Amino acid sequence: MTIIAHGQDQLGHFPLLKESFYGNGSRSFTLLDQALDLAALGFFVFPVTKDKKPLKGCRWKLEASKDFLIVNEMHWANAHGVAIDCLKSGLLVLDADVHDGKQGLKELRRLEALYEEVREAPRVSTPSGGVHIYL
């Protein structure tokens, strides 16, 4: 599983980064900046296309990295987003979808009632109106 951190036009959908690293949002940033910030947090990152797929020729399972030198050499100019290799990064993401008639938010409320960890976990809104919960 991967998490996609979208480019500048969708920073509002990634408030964890916006609040933690970009203050009031006045700082301009690139995908490389975002990738390096995520790598600094210990996440293994790699560039993706507009369709959230690894760039052509990218063997993401092997090449995802948190090493600044390696991340800096990835082909960010051709990318449309930053992805995180969740398995390598030790990250679990709950994806509460609402598109196509899915009831993800209803199920999320049930999980929040049962588990404090889910209630307190960092989260972001997705472009389709759902939520990603980071555990």
Residue ranges and their predicted role:
Residues 2-135:
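Conserved phosphate/metal-binding and DNA-contacting active-site motifs used
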